Amino acid sequence: MNQQTFTQPKAQNLNLLAVIGFNGGVIDGLILHPDNETLIFPIGSQIVVRNVLSRQDRFLKGHTNDISTLTVSNSGRYLASGQKTFSGFKADIILWDLTTLSIVNRFSIHKFLIQSLSFSYNDKYLVSLGGIEDNFIIVWEIETGKPLCCNTAGSDFVHQVKFFNNSDNKIVTCQNFGIKIWTVDYIEKKVSSVDVNFGNLKRKILCMIIDPKDKFAYVGTETGDILEIDLQIAIYKRIGPVKRLFPQGINCIKLLPNKDLLLGSKEGIIAKINFNDFRIKKEGKVLGGVTSMTLTTECAYFFCGTEQSNIYWVETASLKSEIRNTCHNDRVNDIHFPYEYSGVFGTCGKEDIRIWNTETRQEHLRIHVPNIECYCFDFMRDGKSIYSGWNDGKIRTFLPQSGKLLYAINECHANGVTAICATSDGRKIVSGGMNGEIRVWKIGNQSQTMETSLKEHRGRVFSIVINSQNDRAVSASADGSCIIWDIINYVRTACLFERTLFKQIVYHPEESQILTTGTNKKITYWDVTDYTEIRSVDATLEGSVNSLSMFNSGEFFVSAGDDREVKIWEYDTSIPRFKGLGHSNPINKVIVAPNQEIICSVSEDGSIFIFATPKETRVAKRDLRKPQ
Protein backbone atom coordinates (compact mmCIF):
# COMPACT_ATOMS: atom_id res chain seq x y z
CA MET A 1 0.00 0.00 0.00
CA ASN A 2 1.43 3.33 -1.04
CA GLN A 3 0.53 6.56 0.77
CA GLN A 4 1.14 9.72 -1.29
CA THR A 5 1.53 13.01 0.55
CA PHE A 6 -0.25 16.10 -0.71
CA THR A 7 1.86 18.69 -2.51
CA GLN A 8 0.06 21.45 -4.34
CA PRO A 9 0.87 20.91 -8.04
CA LYS A 10 0.63 23.56 -10.69
CA ALA A 11 -2.68 22.73 -12.30
CA GLN A 12 -3.95 24.60 -15.34
CA ASN A 13 -7.27 26.40 -15.08
CA LEU A 14 -10.32 24.97 -16.83
CA ASN A 15 -12.31 27.18 -19.18
CA LEU A 16 -15.67 28.07 -17.65
CA LEU A 17 -18.23 27.93 -20.47
CA ALA A 18 -21.42 28.87 -18.66
CA VAL A 19 -23.17 29.13 -15.34
CA ILE A 20 -26.82 28.31 -14.72
CA GLY A 21 -27.79 30.29 -11.69
CA PHE A 22 -28.80 33.60 -10.20
CA ASN A 23 -28.53 34.76 -6.60
CA GLY A 24 -32.02 36.16 -6.25
CA GLY A 25 -31.52 36.98 -2.59
CA VAL A 26 -29.39 40.06 -3.40
CA ILE A 27 -31.60 43.15 -3.31
CA ASP A 28 -31.27 45.08 -6.61
CA GLY A 29 -28.72 42.49 -7.71
CA LEU A 30 -30.11 42.21 -11.25
CA ILE A 31 -28.95 45.22 -13.28
CA LEU A 32 -29.50 46.11 -16.93
CA HIS A 33 -26.51 48.11 -18.19
CA PRO A 34 -27.24 51.54 -19.75
CA ASP A 35 -26.31 50.06 -23.16
CA ASN A 36 -29.62 48.14 -22.95
CA GLU A 37 -27.93 44.89 -24.02
CA THR A 38 -25.95 43.71 -21.00
CA LEU A 39 -27.47 42.06 -17.96
CA ILE A 40 -25.35 41.92 -14.80
CA PHE A 41 -26.08 39.69 -11.81
CA PRO A 42 -24.24 37.73 -9.09
CA ILE A 43 -23.79 33.99 -8.70
CA GLY A 44 -22.00 33.13 -5.49
CA SER A 45 -18.65 34.95 -5.52
CA GLN A 46 -18.77 35.68 -9.28
CA ILE A 47 -20.50 38.33 -11.35
CA VAL A 48 -22.05 37.30 -14.66
CA VAL A 49 -22.00 39.85 -17.49
CA ARG A 50 -24.46 38.50 -20.05
CA ASN A 51 -25.31 39.82 -23.49
CA VAL A 52 -29.08 39.41 -23.64
CA LEU A 53 -29.07 39.19 -27.45
CA SER A 54 -26.33 36.61 -28.03
CA ARG A 55 -26.58 35.05 -24.54
CA GLN A 56 -22.80 35.12 -24.29
CA ASP A 57 -21.57 35.11 -20.70
CA ARG A 58 -18.45 36.74 -19.31
CA PHE A 59 -17.37 36.41 -15.70
CA LEU A 60 -15.85 38.77 -13.17
CA LYS A 61 -13.82 36.90 -10.56
CA GLY A 62 -12.22 38.57 -7.57
CA HIS A 63 -14.40 38.08 -4.51
CA THR A 64 -13.62 35.41 -1.94
CA ASN A 65 -17.18 34.91 -0.69
CA ASP A 66 -20.79 35.48 -1.69
CA ILE A 67 -21.59 38.85 -3.26
CA SER A 68 -24.03 40.91 -1.19
CA THR A 69 -24.64 44.02 -3.31
CA LEU A 70 -24.06 45.50 -6.79
CA THR A 71 -24.37 48.89 -8.45
CA VAL A 72 -23.50 50.37 -11.87
CA SER A 73 -22.51 54.00 -12.46
CA ASN A 74 -24.73 56.28 -14.55
CA SER A 75 -22.21 56.33 -17.40
CA GLY A 76 -22.07 52.53 -17.44
CA ARG A 77 -18.29 52.50 -17.14
CA TYR A 78 -17.95 51.35 -13.55
CA LEU A 79 -19.41 48.49 -11.56
CA ALA A 80 -19.02 48.27 -7.79
CA SER A 81 -19.63 45.04 -5.90
CA GLY A 82 -19.49 44.15 -2.23
CA GLN A 83 -19.31 40.81 -0.50
CA LYS A 84 -20.04 39.24 2.82
CA THR A 85 -17.42 37.43 4.84
CA PHE A 86 -17.11 36.07 8.38
CA SER A 87 -17.72 37.86 11.66
CA GLY A 88 -14.77 40.07 12.56
CA PHE A 89 -13.15 39.87 9.12
CA LYS A 90 -12.97 42.66 6.54
CA ALA A 91 -15.34 42.57 3.57
CA ASP A 92 -14.03 43.75 0.20
CA ILE A 93 -15.53 46.24 -2.22
CA ILE A 94 -14.27 45.81 -5.78
CA LEU A 95 -14.45 48.56 -8.39
CA TRP A 96 -14.61 47.13 -11.92
CA ASP A 97 -14.08 48.74 -15.31
CA LEU A 98 -16.84 47.29 -17.49
CA THR A 99 -15.13 48.27 -20.74
CA THR A 100 -12.15 46.01 -20.00
CA LEU A 101 -13.79 43.76 -17.37
CA SER A 102 -10.82 44.40 -15.09
CA ILE A 103 -10.41 45.39 -11.46
CA VAL A 104 -9.75 49.11 -10.99
CA ASN A 105 -9.48 49.11 -7.22
CA ARG A 106 -10.25 47.12 -4.10
CA PHE A 107 -11.47 48.75 -0.88
CA SER A 108 -11.15 46.90 2.44
CA ILE A 109 -12.35 48.79 5.52
CA HIS A 110 -15.86 47.52 6.28
CA LYS A 111 -16.27 44.40 8.38
CA PHE A 112 -18.40 41.27 7.76
CA LEU A 113 -20.79 42.63 5.10
CA ILE A 114 -21.25 45.33 2.49
CA GLN A 115 -24.93 46.26 2.74
CA SER A 116 -25.32 48.82 -0.05
CA LEU A 117 -23.35 50.84 -2.63
CA SER A 118 -24.09 53.92 -4.74
CA PHE A 119 -22.22 56.04 -7.32
CA SER A 120 -22.47 59.81 -7.57
CA TYR A 121 -24.07 61.11 -10.75
CA ASN A 122 -20.69 62.24 -12.18
CA ASP A 123 -18.80 58.99 -11.39
CA LYS A 124 -16.42 60.84 -9.04
CA TYR A 125 -17.44 59.23 -5.77
CA LEU A 126 -18.71 55.95 -4.39
CA VAL A 127 -20.55 55.65 -1.08
CA SER A 128 -20.57 52.35 0.78
CA LEU A 129 -22.64 51.12 3.69
CA GLY A 130 -21.47 48.40 6.07
CA GLY A 131 -23.64 45.66 7.50
CA ILE A 132 -25.04 45.17 10.97
CA GLU A 133 -21.62 44.59 12.57
CA ASP A 134 -20.16 47.68 10.91
CA ASN A 135 -22.94 50.20 10.17
CA PHE A 136 -20.49 52.82 8.84
CA ILE A 137 -20.94 55.07 5.82
CA ILE A 138 -17.75 55.69 3.84
CA VAL A 139 -17.35 57.99 0.83
CA TRP A 140 -14.58 56.94 -1.59
CA GLU A 141 -12.88 58.94 -4.32
CA ILE A 142 -12.88 56.77 -7.43
CA GLU A 143 -9.85 58.35 -9.10
CA THR A 144 -7.49 57.84 -6.15
CA GLY A 145 -9.24 54.92 -4.46
CA LYS A 146 -8.92 56.64 -1.08
CA PRO A 147 -11.64 57.04 1.57
CA LEU A 148 -12.54 60.72 1.96
CA CYS A 149 -14.80 60.64 5.00
CA CYS A 150 -16.48 58.16 7.31
CA ASN A 151 -19.30 58.26 9.85
CA THR A 152 -21.50 55.85 11.73
CA ALA A 153 -24.90 55.46 10.10
CA GLY A 154 -26.72 55.61 13.44
CA SER A 155 -28.02 53.26 16.09
CA ASP A 156 -30.57 51.57 13.80
CA PHE A 157 -29.74 49.04 11.10
CA VAL A 158 -29.47 50.79 7.71
CA HIS A 159 -30.84 48.99 4.65
CA GLN A 160 -29.85 51.19 1.72
CA VAL A 161 -27.78 54.22 0.72
CA LYS A 162 -28.14 56.41 -2.38
CA PHE A 163 -26.56 59.54 -3.84
CA PHE A 164 -28.81 62.32 -5.10
CA ASN A 165 -29.30 62.31 -8.88
CA ASN A 166 -27.89 65.82 -9.44
CA SER A 167 -25.55 66.38 -6.51
CA ASP A 168 -22.41 64.57 -5.46
CA ASN A 169 -22.48 65.81 -1.85
CA LYS A 170 -25.99 64.72 -0.88
CA ILE A 171 -26.76 61.18 0.29
CA VAL A 172 -29.90 59.48 1.62
CA THR A 173 -30.02 56.41 3.86
CA CYS A 174 -33.10 54.41 4.80
CA GLN A 175 -33.09 52.41 8.00
CA ASN A 176 -35.28 50.90 10.67
CA PHE A 177 -37.81 53.60 11.62
CA GLY A 178 -36.11 56.50 9.90
CA ILE A 179 -34.46 58.25 6.98
CA LYS A 180 -31.36 60.43 7.13
CA ILE A 181 -30.25 63.04 4.59
CA TRP A 182 -26.48 63.43 4.64
CA THR A 183 -24.30 66.32 3.44
CA VAL A 184 -20.68 65.61 2.54
CA ASP A 185 -18.07 68.32 3.07
CA TYR A 186 -15.17 67.29 0.82
CA ILE A 187 -12.95 70.15 2.03
CA GLU A 188 -13.28 69.40 5.74
CA LYS A 189 -13.72 65.69 4.97
CA LYS A 190 -16.70 65.15 7.20
CA VAL A 191 -20.34 64.10 6.92
CA SER A 192 -23.35 65.56 8.71
CA SER A 193 -26.94 64.32 8.70
CA VAL A 194 -30.53 65.49 9.19
CA ASP A 195 -33.33 63.14 10.26
CA VAL A 196 -36.57 63.19 8.27
CA ASN A 197 -39.55 64.17 10.41
CA PHE A 198 -42.20 61.42 10.42
CA GLY A 199 -44.30 62.77 13.29
CA ASN A 200 -46.06 59.90 15.05
CA LEU A 201 -45.69 57.56 12.07
CA LYS A 202 -43.36 54.59 12.56
CA ARG A 203 -42.31 52.38 9.69
CA LYS A 204 -39.43 49.97 9.02
CA ILE A 205 -38.11 51.27 5.70
CA LEU A 206 -36.55 48.73 3.31
CA CYS A 207 -35.97 50.48 -0.04
CA MET A 208 -36.16 53.84 -1.77
CA ILE A 209 -36.00 55.72 -5.06
CA ILE A 210 -35.18 59.40 -5.60
CA ASP A 211 -36.95 61.40 -8.31
CA PRO A 212 -34.82 62.89 -11.16
CA LYS A 213 -35.04 66.45 -9.74
CA ASP A 214 -34.00 65.39 -6.20
CA LYS A 215 -37.14 66.93 -4.71
CA PHE A 216 -38.83 63.79 -3.43
CA ALA A 217 -37.94 60.27 -2.37
CA TYR A 218 -40.36 57.35 -2.36
CA VAL A 219 -39.70 54.57 0.13
CA GLY A 220 -41.13 51.08 0.58
CA THR A 221 -41.78 49.69 4.04
CA GLU A 222 -42.01 46.32 5.73
CA THR A 223 -45.65 47.13 6.52
CA GLY A 224 -46.38 47.13 2.80
CA ASP A 225 -47.02 50.81 2.12
CA ILE A 226 -45.21 53.64 0.29
CA LEU A 227 -44.15 56.95 1.80
CA GLU A 228 -43.42 60.18 -0.05
CA ILE A 229 -40.57 62.21 1.48
CA ASP A 230 -39.86 65.88 0.72
CA LEU A 231 -36.06 66.01 0.51
CA GLN A 232 -35.91 69.82 0.53
CA ILE A 233 -37.39 70.21 4.02
CA ALA A 234 -36.81 66.64 5.30
CA ILE A 235 -40.43 65.85 6.10
CA TYR A 236 -42.87 63.04 5.35
CA LYS A 237 -45.65 64.17 2.98
CA ARG A 238 -48.10 61.34 2.23
CA ILE A 239 -48.68 57.60 2.38
CA GLY A 240 -50.17 54.99 0.03
CA PRO A 241 -51.39 52.94 -1.71
CA VAL A 242 -55.00 53.78 -0.94
CA LYS A 243 -57.04 50.96 0.66
CA ARG A 244 -54.37 48.35 0.03
CA LEU A 245 -51.20 47.09 1.68
CA PHE A 246 -48.70 44.44 0.62
CA PRO A 247 -48.60 42.33 3.80
CA GLN A 248 -45.09 40.90 3.52
CA GLY A 249 -43.48 44.23 2.68
CA ILE A 250 -41.99 46.01 -0.34
CA ASN A 251 -38.51 44.95 -1.45
CA CYS A 252 -37.83 47.28 -4.37
CA ILE A 253 -39.32 50.37 -5.95
CA LYS A 254 -38.82 52.21 -9.27
CA LEU A 255 -40.02 55.50 -10.75
CA LEU A 256 -41.44 55.64 -14.29
CA PRO A 257 -41.11 58.67 -16.64
CA ASN A 258 -44.78 59.62 -16.05
CA LYS A 259 -44.03 59.64 -12.27
CA ASP A 260 -45.99 56.44 -11.65
CA LEU A 261 -44.35 54.09 -9.17
CA LEU A 262 -43.41 50.49 -9.88
CA LEU A 263 -42.98 48.26 -6.85
CA GLY A 264 -42.15 44.64 -6.11
CA SER A 265 -43.28 42.91 -2.93
CA LYS A 266 -42.01 39.96 -0.91
CA GLU A 267 -45.11 37.97 -1.84
CA GLY A 268 -44.28 38.13 -5.56
CA ILE A 269 -46.62 40.96 -6.57
CA ILE A 270 -45.59 43.61 -9.11
CA ALA A 271 -47.78 46.70 -8.92
CA LYS A 272 -48.01 50.04 -10.71
CA ILE A 273 -49.10 52.95 -8.49
CA ASN A 274 -50.70 56.14 -9.80
CA PHE A 275 -48.59 59.12 -8.79
CA ASN A 276 -51.49 61.54 -8.25
CA ASP A 277 -53.73 59.55 -5.90
CA PHE A 278 -51.46 56.63 -4.88
CA ARG A 279 -53.99 54.07 -6.13
CA ILE A 280 -53.02 50.76 -7.74
CA LYS A 281 -53.37 50.94 -11.54
CA LYS A 282 -52.07 47.51 -12.54
CA GLU A 283 -50.96 44.39 -10.77
CA GLY A 284 -49.04 41.25 -11.76
CA LYS A 285 -47.75 38.11 -10.07
CA VAL A 286 -44.46 36.23 -10.34
CA LEU A 287 -43.06 33.19 -8.58
CA GLY A 288 -41.09 34.21 -5.49
CA GLY A 289 -40.60 37.48 -3.68
CA VAL A 290 -39.44 40.31 -5.98
CA THR A 291 -35.90 41.45 -5.14
CA SER A 292 -34.83 43.29 -8.32
CA MET A 293 -36.43 45.37 -11.06
CA THR A 294 -34.29 46.96 -13.78
CA LEU A 295 -35.89 49.04 -16.53
CA THR A 296 -34.85 49.39 -20.16
CA THR A 297 -33.84 52.87 -21.32
CA GLU A 298 -37.31 53.46 -22.86
CA CYS A 299 -38.96 52.02 -19.71
CA ALA A 300 -41.32 49.97 -21.90
CA TYR A 301 -40.06 46.71 -20.40
CA PHE A 302 -38.08 45.62 -17.38
CA PHE A 303 -36.32 42.57 -16.01
CA CYS A 304 -37.57 41.26 -12.69
CA GLY A 305 -35.57 38.99 -10.36
CA THR A 306 -37.10 36.95 -7.54
CA GLU A 307 -35.99 35.15 -4.38
CA GLN A 308 -36.60 31.81 -6.11
CA SER A 309 -33.85 32.67 -8.61
CA ASN A 310 -36.20 33.37 -11.52
CA ILE A 311 -35.64 36.18 -14.03
CA TYR A 312 -38.76 37.55 -15.77
CA TRP A 313 -39.21 39.87 -18.75
CA VAL A 314 -42.16 42.15 -17.96
CA GLU A 315 -44.08 44.64 -20.08
CA THR A 316 -44.42 47.88 -18.11
CA ALA A 317 -47.85 48.85 -19.46
CA SER A 318 -49.69 45.57 -18.85
CA LEU A 319 -47.32 43.95 -16.30
CA LYS A 320 -47.54 40.72 -18.30
CA SER A 321 -44.49 38.61 -17.53
CA GLU A 322 -42.65 35.77 -19.21
CA ILE A 323 -39.90 33.78 -17.58
CA ARG A 324 -36.48 34.16 -19.22
CA ASN A 325 -34.18 32.30 -16.85
CA THR A 326 -34.68 29.94 -13.97
CA CYS A 327 -32.51 27.79 -11.75
CA HIS A 328 -32.44 26.08 -8.38
CA ASN A 329 -32.75 28.46 -5.44
CA ASP A 330 -31.47 25.92 -2.93
CA ARG A 331 -28.83 23.20 -2.86
CA VAL A 332 -28.59 20.76 -5.76
CA ASN A 333 -28.11 17.17 -4.59
CA ASP A 334 -27.43 15.23 -7.78
CA ILE A 335 -26.71 15.58 -11.51
CA HIS A 336 -26.80 13.01 -14.33
CA PHE A 337 -26.73 12.70 -18.11
CA PRO A 338 -28.79 10.10 -19.97
CA TYR A 339 -26.80 7.08 -21.09
CA GLU A 340 -24.48 8.03 -23.98
CA TYR A 341 -26.37 11.26 -24.70
CA SER A 342 -25.00 14.72 -23.89
CA GLY A 343 -27.79 16.89 -25.30
CA VAL A 344 -29.58 17.20 -21.97
CA PHE A 345 -28.81 16.64 -18.31
CA GLY A 346 -30.85 16.51 -15.15
CA THR A 347 -30.49 17.93 -11.66
CA CYS A 348 -32.44 17.41 -8.47
CA GLY A 349 -32.92 19.30 -5.24
CA LYS A 350 -35.60 20.69 -3.00
CA GLU A 351 -39.08 19.96 -4.37
CA ASP A 352 -38.10 19.19 -7.95
CA ILE A 353 -36.15 17.44 -10.68
CA ARG A 354 -35.15 19.62 -13.64
CA ILE A 355 -34.04 18.69 -17.14
CA TRP A 356 -31.75 21.18 -18.90
CA ASN A 357 -30.66 21.68 -22.50
CA THR A 358 -26.87 21.43 -22.55
CA GLU A 359 -26.36 23.88 -25.42
CA THR A 360 -28.90 26.61 -24.60
CA ARG A 361 -28.75 26.07 -20.79
CA GLN A 362 -32.52 26.49 -20.70
CA GLU A 363 -34.87 24.41 -18.59
CA HIS A 364 -36.73 21.80 -20.66
CA LEU A 365 -38.79 20.14 -17.96
CA ARG A 366 -39.51 20.60 -14.27
CA ILE A 367 -40.94 17.74 -12.23
CA HIS A 368 -42.36 19.42 -9.14
CA VAL A 369 -43.23 17.52 -5.96
CA PRO A 370 -44.07 20.11 -3.28
CA ASN A 371 -42.71 20.16 0.27
CA ILE A 372 -40.23 17.29 -0.10
CA GLU A 373 -36.63 16.99 -1.28
CA CYS A 374 -35.12 14.76 -3.94
CA TYR A 375 -31.85 13.27 -2.69
CA CYS A 376 -30.88 11.24 -5.76
CA PHE A 377 -32.04 10.30 -9.26
CA ASP A 378 -30.85 8.87 -12.56
CA PHE A 379 -32.03 8.03 -16.07
CA MET A 380 -32.85 4.44 -16.98
CA ARG A 381 -30.39 3.01 -19.49
CA ASP A 382 -33.09 2.85 -22.20
CA GLY A 383 -33.99 6.51 -21.58
CA LYS A 384 -37.67 5.76 -21.07
CA SER A 385 -37.94 6.83 -17.44
CA ILE A 386 -36.33 8.81 -14.62
CA TYR A 387 -36.14 7.09 -11.23
CA SER A 388 -35.56 9.08 -8.06
CA GLY A 389 -35.30 8.86 -4.27
CA TRP A 390 -36.98 11.37 -1.94
CA ASN A 391 -36.80 12.32 1.72
CA ASP A 392 -40.32 11.00 2.37
CA GLY A 393 -38.98 7.48 1.84
CA LYS A 394 -40.49 6.92 -1.62
CA ILE A 395 -38.99 5.96 -4.96
CA ARG A 396 -40.74 7.83 -7.75
CA THR A 397 -40.33 7.15 -11.46
CA PHE A 398 -41.35 9.70 -14.09
CA LEU A 399 -41.67 9.89 -17.86
CA PRO A 400 -38.80 12.01 -19.25
CA GLN A 401 -40.84 13.87 -21.88
CA SER A 402 -43.88 14.93 -19.85
CA GLY A 403 -42.72 14.50 -16.26
CA LYS A 404 -45.81 12.41 -15.55
CA LEU A 405 -45.53 10.01 -12.61
CA LEU A 406 -45.09 6.46 -13.92
CA TYR A 407 -45.13 4.70 -10.56
CA ALA A 408 -44.17 5.24 -6.93
CA ILE A 409 -42.85 2.71 -4.44
CA ASN A 410 -44.06 3.70 -0.98
CA GLU A 411 -42.21 3.26 2.32
CA CYS A 412 -38.93 2.21 0.74
CA HIS A 413 -36.79 3.63 3.54
CA ALA A 414 -37.82 5.07 6.89
CA ASN A 415 -36.04 8.43 6.78
CA GLY A 416 -35.54 8.95 3.07
CA VAL A 417 -33.98 7.33 0.00
CA THR A 418 -30.43 8.71 -0.10
CA ALA A 419 -28.81 6.63 -2.89
CA ILE A 420 -30.21 4.79 -5.88
CA CYS A 421 -28.95 2.85 -8.89
CA ALA A 422 -30.57 0.63 -11.52
CA THR A 423 -29.23 -2.31 -13.50
CA SER A 424 -28.54 -1.77 -17.19
CA ASP A 425 -31.58 -3.85 -18.19
CA GLY A 426 -33.84 -1.78 -15.94
CA ARG A 427 -35.23 -4.82 -14.13
CA LYS A 428 -33.78 -4.03 -10.72
CA ILE A 429 -33.31 -0.91 -8.63
CA VAL A 430 -30.93 -0.93 -5.68
CA SER A 431 -31.65 1.76 -3.09
CA GLY A 432 -29.99 2.93 0.11
CA GLY A 433 -31.52 4.77 3.01
CA MET A 434 -30.71 7.21 5.77
CA ASN A 435 -30.49 4.38 8.31
CA GLY A 436 -28.13 2.22 6.24
CA GLU A 437 -30.50 -0.32 4.68
CA ILE A 438 -29.79 -1.62 1.17
CA ARG A 439 -32.89 -2.84 -0.63
CA VAL A 440 -33.27 -4.46 -4.03
CA TRP A 441 -36.48 -3.88 -5.99
CA LYS A 442 -37.74 -5.94 -8.90
CA ILE A 443 -39.28 -3.72 -11.56
CA GLY A 444 -41.99 -5.33 -13.67
CA ASN A 445 -44.36 -3.97 -16.26
CA GLN A 446 -47.19 -3.57 -13.78
CA SER A 447 -45.59 -4.18 -10.39
CA GLN A 448 -42.63 -3.24 -8.20
CA THR A 449 -41.69 -5.66 -5.43
CA MET A 450 -38.90 -5.80 -2.87
CA GLU A 451 -36.57 -8.73 -3.47
CA THR A 452 -34.48 -8.34 -0.31
CA SER A 453 -33.42 -5.96 2.45
CA LEU A 454 -29.76 -6.03 3.43
CA LYS A 455 -28.87 -4.51 6.78
CA GLU A 456 -25.11 -4.17 7.23
CA HIS A 457 -24.44 -0.43 7.20
CA ARG A 458 -25.01 1.60 10.34
CA GLY A 459 -25.08 5.03 8.76
CA ARG A 460 -26.46 6.89 5.77
CA VAL A 461 -25.77 5.35 2.37
CA PHE A 462 -24.30 8.06 0.13
CA SER A 463 -23.55 6.18 -3.08
CA ILE A 464 -24.39 2.94 -4.91
CA VAL A 465 -22.85 1.66 -8.15
CA ILE A 466 -23.56 -1.53 -10.13
CA ASN A 467 -21.09 -3.26 -12.44
CA SER A 468 -21.70 -3.92 -16.13
CA GLN A 469 -22.59 -7.57 -15.51
CA ASN A 470 -25.43 -6.56 -13.17
CA ASP A 471 -24.30 -9.07 -10.54
CA ARG A 472 -22.36 -6.83 -8.14
CA ALA A 473 -23.33 -3.62 -6.35
CA VAL A 474 -21.08 -1.50 -4.17
CA SER A 475 -22.49 0.80 -1.50
CA ALA A 476 -20.63 3.60 0.30
CA SER A 477 -21.81 4.64 3.75
CA ALA A 478 -21.19 7.24 6.43
CA ASP A 479 -20.25 4.46 8.87
CA GLY A 480 -16.83 4.15 7.21
CA SER A 481 -17.53 1.04 5.17
CA CYS A 482 -18.02 0.16 1.51
CA ILE A 483 -19.77 -3.16 0.99
CA ILE A 484 -19.72 -5.25 -2.18
CA TRP A 485 -23.00 -7.09 -2.62
CA ASP A 486 -23.95 -10.09 -4.74
CA ILE A 487 -27.31 -8.92 -6.08
CA ILE A 488 -28.07 -12.31 -7.61
CA ASN A 489 -27.84 -14.28 -4.37
CA TYR A 490 -28.27 -11.23 -2.13
CA VAL A 491 -25.26 -11.73 0.11
CA ARG A 492 -22.26 -9.65 1.10
CA THR A 493 -19.09 -10.67 -0.71
CA ALA A 494 -16.56 -8.18 0.70
CA CYS A 495 -16.22 -5.07 2.82
CA LEU A 496 -13.83 -2.12 2.74
CA PHE A 497 -13.10 -0.08 5.86
CA GLU A 498 -11.57 3.35 6.40
CA ARG A 499 -11.70 6.05 9.05
CA THR A 500 -13.95 8.30 7.02
CA LEU A 501 -17.51 9.02 6.02
CA PHE A 502 -17.56 7.62 2.49
CA LYS A 503 -19.26 10.05 0.10
CA GLN A 504 -18.94 8.37 -3.31
CA ILE A 505 -17.61 5.33 -5.07
CA VAL A 506 -16.95 4.83 -8.80
CA TYR A 507 -15.77 1.97 -10.98
CA HIS A 508 -12.85 2.32 -13.36
CA PRO A 509 -14.21 1.76 -16.91
CA GLU A 510 -12.36 -1.58 -17.05
CA GLU A 511 -13.90 -2.48 -13.65
CA SER A 512 -10.56 -3.73 -12.37
CA GLN A 513 -10.39 -1.02 -9.71
CA ILE A 514 -12.71 1.24 -7.76
CA LEU A 515 -12.20 4.73 -6.34
CA THR A 516 -13.64 5.95 -3.05
CA THR A 517 -13.67 9.33 -1.39
CA GLY A 518 -15.04 10.96 1.72
CA THR A 519 -14.41 13.21 4.69
CA ASN A 520 -10.79 12.12 5.21
CA LYS A 521 -9.77 14.39 2.27
CA LYS A 522 -8.37 11.40 0.38
CA ILE A 523 -9.08 9.52 -2.83
CA THR A 524 -8.41 5.81 -2.41
CA TYR A 525 -7.76 3.20 -5.11
CA TRP A 526 -8.98 -0.37 -4.42
CA ASP A 527 -8.35 -3.63 -6.27
CA VAL A 528 -11.57 -5.40 -7.26
CA THR A 529 -10.10 -8.92 -7.24
CA ASP A 530 -9.10 -9.05 -3.56
CA TYR A 531 -10.51 -5.66 -2.42
CA THR A 532 -7.23 -4.43 -1.00
CA GLU A 533 -6.13 -0.82 -0.94
CA ILE A 534 -3.70 0.02 -3.74
CA ARG A 535 -2.90 3.59 -2.77
CA SER A 536 -4.38 6.67 -1.15
CA VAL A 537 -3.95 10.24 -2.38
CA ASP A 538 -4.42 13.45 -0.38
CA ALA A 539 -6.89 15.31 -2.57
CA THR A 540 -7.61 18.53 -0.72
CA LEU A 541 -6.55 20.73 2.15
CA GLU A 542 -10.07 21.85 3.04
CA GLY A 543 -13.16 19.81 3.92
CA SER A 544 -14.27 16.59 2.31
CA VAL A 545 -14.19 15.32 -1.27
CA ASN A 546 -17.86 14.84 -2.11
CA SER A 547 -17.93 13.53 -5.67
CA LEU A 548 -15.98 11.62 -8.33
CA SER A 549 -16.54 11.00 -12.03
CA MET A 550 -14.52 8.97 -14.54
CA PHE A 551 -13.59 9.77 -18.13
CA ASN A 552 -14.44 6.99 -20.58
CA SER A 553 -10.77 6.41 -21.36
CA GLY A 554 -10.05 5.59 -17.74
CA GLU A 555 -6.92 7.75 -17.88
CA PHE A 556 -8.45 10.75 -16.11
CA PHE A 557 -11.07 11.33 -13.44
CA VAL A 558 -12.70 14.36 -11.82
CA SER A 559 -13.15 15.23 -8.15
CA ALA A 560 -14.98 18.03 -6.33
CA GLY A 561 -15.91 18.87 -2.77
CA ASP A 562 -15.88 21.38 0.05
CA ASP A 563 -12.81 23.20 -1.30
CA ARG A 564 -15.06 24.52 -4.12
CA GLU A 565 -12.68 23.35 -6.85
CA VAL A 566 -13.25 20.94 -9.74
CA LYS A 567 -10.06 18.95 -10.32
CA ILE A 568 -9.07 16.68 -13.20
CA TRP A 569 -6.62 13.98 -12.10
CA GLU A 570 -4.38 11.74 -14.15
CA TYR A 571 -5.44 8.25 -13.08
CA ASP A 572 -2.09 6.44 -13.14
CA THR A 573 0.04 9.16 -11.54
CA SER A 574 -2.67 10.62 -9.25
CA ILE A 575 -1.54 14.14 -10.18
CA PRO A 576 -4.13 16.93 -10.58
CA ARG A 577 -3.61 18.36 -14.07
CA PHE A 578 -6.46 20.88 -14.27
CA LYS A 579 -8.73 22.73 -11.88
CA GLY A 580 -11.96 24.65 -12.33
CA LEU A 581 -12.65 27.67 -10.12
CA GLY A 582 -15.74 29.77 -9.52
CA HIS A 583 -17.91 28.01 -6.97
CA SER A 584 -18.33 29.91 -3.72
CA ASN A 585 -20.08 27.08 -1.89
CA PRO A 586 -19.25 23.39 -1.41
CA ILE A 587 -19.72 21.28 -4.53
CA ASN A 588 -22.11 18.37 -4.01
CA LYS A 589 -21.74 16.52 -7.32
CA VAL A 590 -19.62 16.59 -10.46
CA ILE A 591 -20.01 14.62 -13.68
CA VAL A 592 -18.29 14.25 -17.05
CA ALA A 593 -20.62 14.37 -20.06
CA PRO A 594 -20.85 11.20 -22.19
CA ASN A 595 -19.18 13.01 -25.10
CA GLN A 596 -16.30 13.95 -22.75
CA GLU A 597 -16.47 17.59 -23.87
CA ILE A 598 -17.86 19.25 -20.74
CA ILE A 599 -17.85 18.81 -16.98
CA CYS A 600 -20.89 19.87 -14.95
CA SER A 601 -20.80 20.59 -11.23
CA VAL A 602 -23.57 21.53 -8.79
CA SER A 603 -23.27 23.15 -5.39
CA GLU A 604 -24.98 24.10 -2.15
CA ASP A 605 -26.10 27.50 -3.47
CA GLY A 606 -28.08 25.98 -6.36
CA SER A 607 -25.72 26.99 -9.17
CA ILE A 608 -24.65 24.73 -12.05
CA PHE A 609 -21.19 25.33 -13.55
CA ILE A 610 -20.25 24.01 -17.00
CA PHE A 611 -16.52 23.67 -17.77
CA ALA A 612 -14.90 22.72 -21.07
CA THR A 613 -12.66 19.67 -20.85
CA PRO A 614 -9.10 19.97 -22.20
CA LYS A 615 -8.45 18.19 -25.50
CA GLU A 616 -5.88 15.82 -24.00
CA THR A 617 -8.48 14.34 -21.65
CA ARG A 618 -11.02 13.53 -24.37
CA VAL A 619 -8.95 10.91 -26.21
CA ALA A 620 -7.19 8.02 -24.56
CA LYS A 621 -3.42 7.88 -24.93
CA ARG A 622 -3.66 4.42 -26.41
CA ASP A 623 -5.92 5.85 -29.15
CA LEU A 624 -3.32 8.52 -29.91
CA ARG A 625 -0.74 5.81 -30.46
CA LYS A 626 -2.85 4.10 -33.13
CA PRO A 627 -1.80 4.70 -36.77
CA GLN A 628 -4.02 7.08 -38.67
Model regions and ranges:
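Terminal intrinsically disordered, low-complexity extensions flanking WD-repeat/beta-propeller proteins
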Residues: 3-10, 189, 196-198, 501, ...
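A short helix->beta-strand "capping" segment at the edge of beta-propeller domains
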Residues: 6-25, 53-57, 192-193
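Beta-strand-rich domains and repeat architectures in extracellular enzymes and scaffolds
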Residues: 17-45
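Short C-terminal beta-strands that terminate individual repeats in beta-propeller domains
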Residues: 18-20, 57-62, 103-109, 147-153, ...
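Canonical WD40 repeat/beta-propeller blade segments in eukaryotic WD-repeat proteins
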Residues: 25-31, 66-71, 112-118, 156-163, ...
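Structural hallmark of WD40 beta-propellers
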Residues: 36-38, 57, 77-82, 124-128, ...
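Conserved strand-to-loop turn within each blade of WD40 beta-propeller repeats
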Residues: 43, 82-85, 89, 129-133, ...
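WD40-repeat beta-propellers
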Residues: 48-51, 90-96, 137-141, 161, ...
